[in-house]
Amino acid sequence: MTSKQRAYLRGLANHLENILHVGKGGVSAMVCKQADDALTARELIQGRVLPTAPESVRTVAETIAASVNAEVVQVIGRVFVLYRRHPEEPKIILPRER
């Protein structure tokens, strides 16, 4: 993913709600399943890591992204953004490389 595409996705993520919350249980199979379902439906999701989580925000985002075959777009504070293109019907069209 290019920096231009990443910047485009960050702009789209500004208006998203946090639909994924990771708490003291850390990254579990249920959290990964929720992320997978949300990415299939939306392609771009925003999540929050609560202060009680045992891992860092970057670690949580990378772990979830690896388990659901997504990309980490951004990590700011306790919030992270993940993107995975829908295989059949993409809703988000990324800008091309020039």
Q: What name fits each language-model region?
A:
Residues 1-98:
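Positively charged, polar, low-complexity stretches
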